[in-house]
Amino acid sequence: MRDYVVIGLVLSSLPIGLFRPFYGLLVYAWISYMYPHMLAWSMAQTFPMAKLSSLSVMGGLLFSPSANVAALRQRENVAMLLLWCTFTISSVFAIYPDQAWVKWQDTSKVILMSVLATILLRDRKQIRLFVLVIALSIGFWGFKGGLFGLATGGNQIVYGPEPSIMGANNAIGLALDMCMPLLWYLASQERGWLKRLLQTFFFLSIPAVMFTYSRGSTLALAVVLLLIMLKSKHRIPLIFAMVIGGVLAVPFIPQKWLERQQTVFTYGEDTSAMSRVDNWKFCWRIAQDYPLTGAGFDFQSRQIFEKYAPEFLVKYNGKVWNTHNIFFSILTSHGFPGFFAFVLMILFCMISCTQLKMAVRGASDLVWVKTYADMIQLSLLAFVINGMFVNMEYFDLPYHWVSVIACLKVIVSRELSGVHDEESYVSAPLEAAAT
């Protein structure tokens, strides 16, 4: 029964996507972040929901009267498209081309849907709905994981929807870390039952992240919570409440969780931690051999380890490890051009958020932009911190932030300059206001 309900909901949304592509984009975001089909039991799990939803959005764009062309020209989008070019080049010269092209298709879908989001997001209402769908979809797994973690006393590991990019414990930890700023800031903007729902998802996401047993996720969680409190108008009561809550919670936290977190300070004695350091050395050796094109997607194999790091195979009894680092993974897979494009994309997003906050100072009708810029900056910071220890460089959310930031820049510049014709839009008003 559950399968029929999920499939029916998706199929019924397809005509909406054709005639109202923005709402089709919301359906796509819901599917991509909540994975409702993974909550079913049989045929819905393999039903191509995301593909059909994306096709309906693309079909709807054919009938769309206009597109947000100005947002596409923003530097964040340019860096993202340059990054996609390096994906393509690295796949042409990949060590394992058959595997690389399969992965290239998956990542190209992420980039394509981010471009479509840039085209479709045009005003505050649309950005709010888009971000709200993302927050509630990922937040659902925080709600579910938090209840599971508390019910089991933290003695079992919290996982995400399997099989998906968010399925592993490290992966769902990163996704929730990135989502928590959204839940917090959106709750400050909403009212009634929606505000309470967002707050519930936020607070249950804390034990959900903790009981993934991911040290990187716990570290990012601590940073996110600290910055949320420091940025709040009620920082003193929040910090006091967090300290008291933490002290009261310690007796109920499993000893094995505390022991695992303590290995952060004794990483030299931890096999898992040292394997990551050794694997980064392995990645650097490959990057030196493939500086311009990279080794391509999914380059890890026993044969490559035997060539570049045979001593690590001996050290870890023949086990082939993942990169466990978004930056080393990009560098090794796509070379230095891909690495610089990836870093620039993130830097441009962070800088633009700062410029947006500076630009809207004193503009009472644009205060909401500061809220969105704050939440996106914190979300990206969580991505960078947690990404130092996990492979999530192709996760959808950072690329969707590119779309949202580009659209926010267009909206702010349009409002500050009084020019409402996007074809005649220039970025000068935003940059001038931010200086």
Question: Where on the chain are the PLM-derived regions?
Answer:
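Transmembrane helix-loop junctions in multipass membrane proteins, especially transporters and channels
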Residues: 41, 66-69, 95-99, 122, ...
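Transmembrane alpha-helices of multi-pass inner-membrane enzymes
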Residues: 55-60, 237, 243-244, 345-349, ...
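Hydrophobic transmembrane alpha-helices and their immediate junctions
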Residues: 230, 334-381, 404, 410
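Juxtamembrane membrane-interface segments at transmembrane alpha-helix termini
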Residues: 37-46, 90-91, 114-121, 141-150, ...
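Alpha-helical transmembrane segments of multi-pass inner-membrane proteins
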Residues: 8-17, 57, 81-92, 109-116, ...
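Membrane-interface micro-motifs in multi-pass membrane enzymes
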Residues: 1-3, 44-51, 102-104, 164-177, ...
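Transmembrane signal-anchor hairpin modules in multi-pass inner-membrane enzymes, especially those
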Residues: 1-89, 95-98, 102, 125-132, ...
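Long extracytoplasmic/lumenal interhelical loops at the membrane interface
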Residues: 159, 163, 265-281, 289, ...
